[in-house]
């Protein structure tokens, strides 16, 4: 979009009367409504207002990985930039400051520092130097059908080097934190804050209410209302999980409250999944660089710091979360109600690359982190439960799992429910990739409460 004047934001407010009246919320809503040109005008006005640039043009990228953010390119009188911002509902009433990139660099993490930043909630945006590097999410996707591990050795080695560097920073910066310090960290916007009703803070609401309450789920061979679905236990390919969705949401709302994470904190990016990682250099010597530190902090609860990368680099793939149409073409899924059980059968499975990513994170990051927490007496007895509830929040709160509510179709919705059950519940009489992972990172059997 070529921009000649600052847009009148008020002209767009009829798109959704309940929408927050902020530029970032408006831009995301306009993109969702297919009004990309108007969204680009809003971003142009935001850049001009926050940084004083004369904006010649703005182009928003079409990006499957930006589920709660926008990015693209801006040409201004001060040069050309790559821009990105993350946006959450109710962010003006949330704790913590967006985009504290400098603390990551000071801690020794490889991070791309923005040239300019606005951190005001509702007007938060970063301007980076213009770059055309690919992100690790895009590079990794190239190998999701690859069965020969020698073909993705370079990508895996780069990921291992990043995991090693991040783990070193976690161990170096590990320190006691108070309940107040935990509550002030913006990482909770990715977990508990998405479950919170700001007008009734004691009640489960937020995205849970807008995504699922009283809604219908169209699954392959079955339609269920949330009232019924939420009270069923789920089995996946014959493995039954221990808790209903209703129970898991209630537990996440209670047990992931920010004050509950008083204990151990680290300096962390907080959302360093591979769509927030640049790939630099030739294939033989790849170097990974973090960017978009929307939730970075210096007192990030240690058990939450690596949850988002663990889920989004591994269990969100192949295809089902970011490319549901591809998942529908490549995978099969069926759903059947059997008494009080929703039985899902699917041929979805982690690809060799995703399993290798999980193994690397297991050995280089989670094992040493949990071992150090235990040696300091800072590992909660129920650490496994907390990790599973946080992992559960990733698929169910990043976007609605309902077919037709966004990008999902019945097949990807069924796979998403299967993954959510695996993240939150314990397998009864069996095992799965996550249960094996958690067993393997436990400092000792007594430290892992199922």
What are these regions (language model features)?
Residues 126-133:
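Short pocket-lining segment of the protein kinase catalytic domain that shapes the ATP-binding cleft
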Residues 70-94:
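ATP-binding glycine-rich loop module of kinase domains
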Residues 91-104:
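The N-lobe alphaC helix and its flanking beta3-alphaC-beta4 segment of protein kinase-like domains
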Residues 104, 281, 288, 296, ...:
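Active-site activation/catalytic loop segments of kinase-like enzymes and analogous catalytic loops
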Residues 13-60, 90-92, 284, 371-450:
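Regulatory N- and C-terminal appendages and interdomain linkers associated
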Residues 105-117:
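Conserved HxN/HPN-centered segment at the entrance to the catalytic loop
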Residues 139-269, 280-283:
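ATP-dependent phospho-/nucleotidyl transfer catalytic cores
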């Amino acid at each position: 979009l070529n921009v000649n004047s600052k847009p009148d934001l008020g002209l767009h407010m009829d798109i959704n009367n309940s929408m927050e009246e902020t530029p970032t919320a408006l831009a995301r809503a306009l993109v969702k409504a297919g009004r990309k040109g108007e969204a680009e005008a809003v971003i142009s006005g935001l850049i001009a207002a926050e940084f004083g640039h004369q904006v010649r043009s703005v182009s928003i990228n079409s990006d499957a990985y930006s589920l709660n953010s926008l990015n693209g390119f801006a040409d201004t009188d001060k040069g050309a930039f790559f821009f990105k911002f993350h946006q959450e509902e109710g962010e003006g009433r949330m704790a913590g400051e967006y985009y504290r990139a400098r603390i990551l660099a000071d801690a020794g993490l490889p991070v791309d520092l923005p040239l300019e930043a606005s951190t005001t909630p509702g007007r938060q945006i970063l301007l980076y130097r213009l770059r055309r590097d690919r992100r690790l999410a895009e590079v990794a996707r190239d190998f999701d059908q690859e069965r020969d591990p020698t073909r993705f050795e370079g990508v895996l080695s780069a990921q291992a080097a990043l995991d090693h560097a991040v783990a070193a920073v976690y161990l170096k910066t590990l320190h006691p934190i108070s309940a107040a310090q935990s509550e002030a960290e913006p990482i909770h916007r990715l977990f508990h804050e998405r479950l919170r009703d700001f007008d009734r803070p004691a009640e489960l609401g937020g995205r849970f209410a807008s995504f699922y309450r009283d809604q219908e789920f169209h699954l392959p061979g079955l339609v269920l209302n949330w009232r019924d679905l939420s009270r069923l236990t789920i089995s996946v390919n014959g493995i039954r999980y221990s808790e209903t969705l209703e129970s898991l949401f209630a537990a996440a709302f209670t047990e992931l409250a920010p004050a509950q994470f008083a204990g151990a904190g680290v300096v962390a990016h907080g959302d360093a999944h591979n769509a927030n990682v640049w790939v630099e250099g030739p294939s033989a010597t790849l170097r990974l660089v973090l960017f978009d530190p929307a939730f970075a902090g210096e007192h990030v609860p240690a058990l939450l710091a690596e949850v988002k990368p663990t889920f989004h680099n591994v269990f969100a793939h192949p295809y089902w979360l970011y490319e549901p149409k591809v998942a529908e073409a490549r995978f099969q899924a069926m759903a059947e109600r059997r008494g009080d059980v929703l039985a899902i059968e699917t041929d979805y499975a982690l690809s060799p690359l995703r399993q290798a990513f999980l193994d690397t994170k297991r050995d280089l990051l989670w094992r040493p982190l949990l071992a150090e927490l235990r040696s300091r007496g800072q590992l909660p007895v129920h650490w496994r439960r907390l990790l599973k509830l946080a992992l559960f929040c990733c698929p169910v709160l990043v976007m609605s799992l309902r077919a037709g509510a966004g990008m999902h179709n019945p097949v990807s919705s069924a796979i998403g429910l299967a993954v959510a059950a695996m993240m939150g519940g314990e397998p009864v009489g069996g095992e799965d990739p996550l249960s094996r992972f958690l067993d393997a990172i436990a400092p000792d059997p007594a430290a892992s409460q199922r």
